[in-house]
Amino acid sequence: DNCGIGAIVNIKGIKTHKTVENALSIVENLEHRAGKDAEGKTGDGVGILLQISHKFFEKAAKNLGINIGKEREYGVGMFFFSQDEFKRKQAMKMFEIIAQKEGLEFLGWRKVPTRPEVLGKKALDVMPGIYQCFVKKPEDCEEGLPFDRKLYILRKVFEQSNEDTYVVSLSSRTIVYKGM
C-alpha cells in the first residue's frame, strides 16, 4: 500500500526499446510515491524488470571478447558489489568458484555504465560497484526453468557465502535494473 507499481508489456512478447522507455516513464510518473531526502536528489530506490535482450547482451559481451552463445543458452546476473576493491574482487572470485562447483561455466564480468554525477551526495557515498556476469547453460540442462533453477541455486549458495554483495537478479529470462 506504500509502493507504486506499474506494468508495461508487449502482449506479442516482442522486445523493443519502446517498452523500456514506457517503463521509465512510469517510474518518472510515480516519483510522488517515492521518498526523497532533504537535498532532493537521493530517493529510496526504484527498479525495473525486463526480458533479457539477447541482441543487446550479445553485442556487449562480444565487445569484451565473450561469446555468450544463442538466446536462452546463458544467464545474466546483476550485482551490487562493495565499493572496496579488495572485497569486490574477492566476491567476484568466490562467485566464479561457486559457479564452477555447481557445474556451470562462468563466462565473464561486465562493468555496468553508470552516471554518478546525477546522484545526490548520500547516494554517491554508498553507490555500489555495479556489474553483470554471464553464465553458460550446461549442455545437459534444458533451457528455461531447469536452467533458471540452477542459476537460483548458484545465487543462493553465493549469497550465503558473501554478505557484502547484493545479487539483484540472476536469470536466463529476465534482468532487474535498480537505481536511487
Enumerate the predicted regions with their spans:
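N-terminal segments that mediate ammonia production and transfer
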Residues: 1-180
